[in-house]
């Protein structure tokens, strides 16, 4: 009985970890479908305007831009989840342990500096930043590039979606700021359940609201992590005033994005080897010239 309940609990726990990924995927593809509809069906042409070659090219550019961003989001997210950031399968070193090494009683092994245990993943993660609940995976040394690039394209995609949904907001507010329009923008679910709006109006209002809220949240996450990258810090190290691992702006960027940092963000398949191994880190003090003793 205990074994059966244990297996059931493991299944429930596994499903719970996958649920945020599924919900994120549904939201991303719903927004993409809605923006595609706005571009293809609700194109901003006046009734008397005819479709020209330029309008066709413009529509094609719109579709290319949004599916380029969608492809980068899904690909980076997939590689982020698949890339193992933990100490599993990693040779951590010999008997000599340097400064900053600690013993993890959960993993029953010594761990290098900047490595910490994640109780959600139940393993220690190299240069652990935080556990990302949206993807059910820890952000660490080996998958930080995919996490940051995914955030970048999510921010760009949501900004694009907000601009494209401007017509939806204009349509809702065309009769002025009324109780009906405000409620539709703030709580579209209540308006749908109470029968005040159609399913179509609810869908457009809900997705437009999601784009705005999502854009603000992703922008905050992106700018915070860009600041961390430039400072050579993790989220855990942000609270400390010291920055022993900050090697300068360009070196900090290379530490996170790799050798080809300046163009690897365009596509997750572009190779960009990281300069370190996630175990040994240069510190600021090691870059300073040694002072000679004065006799």
Swiss-Prot record:
GO terms for molecular function: protein-cysteine S-palmitoyltransferase activity. GO terms for cellular component: endoplasmic reticulum; Golgi apparatus; membrane. Residues 102-152 form the DHHC domain. It is a multi-pass membrane protein. It is found in: Membrane. Belongs to the DHHC palmitoyltransferase family. This is Probable palmitoyltransferase ZDHHC24. It comes from Danio rerio.
